[in-house]
């Protein structure tokens, strides 16, 4: 390839990467818009307990983790673009299930069941979307810029959470759950149309090691990622109820604060994992996350809680790409999609387990206790990361 063609190819790939990331933003609004609303809908409108709130939120992540293997194989064997577009379509179907839950004149258990069906479909769609877009982006710009690909995808995801949380509460309070569901149904279809003309990358060929051998290569960074994920899971599941229990307003803006600092860190410092390696960046990030969660635990006012959420977002921001760089180093190219899917599955498991367990903890010890549990998990994550990579 000539120097001229390289100069034209790199901007073209970067523009395609931007289009993919923007489509992720649109699609992930199906997660961001309902995230602060579902706890209120389940607890206040349907009359269920904190544990059921945790199940309603967390079950999506179990669906995601159970389909990560399929998503990775699909991306590796049949192409990442197919996986990504399939995920966008599935996320739109989740909105349709929630629309039925809102409009059908049925009992609370049936509405809850439809809500759960939508969450399961969303989990399936999310696994296809994120595994597909990460593998697609790596195919466009190359593994040496894996940190950039993960950073851009993360900015899209948490930008959607930052924008979606207050917007979701606004739509719900003014127009109801049906309007929220309809919005989440339309946005992924717009993303699908936006990405339709982005060039696909070829599926990888070559000998494929078994799934368990891939897991054996990635479990150390995966465990660190899982322990980080507890903090976001408790914020996403219980922050709305925490604010309501204290008589505070602005609950939706906690996710805006979290997502805003998350995106800002990716913009300003997303290059660090590629430059300095993942382990150092991950340890510092986990320290910042711990500080934010402790602030949420002790917050005497809504404003202090917002600062805690912002600090937590800043801490969580670089952990996925930081430890993800270590994953890409450890696996052959033909199973990169499977490896990234498996790596992300550790976070999905963390999200899925945290919701119900934190619900039991909140009922027994109060809502602040879940943020203390998140901080303890982050500290354990620091120890695990240091011990796991001390020879690396």
UniProtKB/Swiss-Prot annotation:
Per the record, the major location class is: membrane
> Mind telling me what this protein is named?
Uncharacterized MFS-type transporter YfcJ
Cellular component (GO) terms are: plasma membrane
Q: Which GO terms describe its molecular function?
A: transmembrane transporter activity
Annotated family = Belongs to the major facilitator superfamily. YfcJ family.
Q: Where in the cell is it found?
A: Cell inner membrane
Q: Which residues cross the membrane?
A: 22-42, 46-66, 97-117, 121-141, 151-171, 174-194, 224-244, 252-272, 276-298, 342-362, 369-389
Q: How does it sit in the membrane?
A: Multi-pass membrane protein
HAMAP family, alphabetized = MFS_YfcJ
Q: Name the UniProt key words of this record, in alphabetical order.
A: Cell inner membrane, Cell membrane, Membrane, Transmembrane, Transmembrane helix, Transport
The cross-references to CDD domains, in alphabetical order and at most eight, read: MFS_YfcJ_like (cd17489)
Q: Which residues form the signal peptide?
A: none
Organism annotation? Salmonella choleraesuis (strain SC-B67)
Q: Which cysteines are joined by disulfide bonds?
A: none
Q: What is the lineage of its organism?
A: Bacteria, Pseudomonadati, Pseudomonadota, Gammaproteobacteria, Enterobacterales
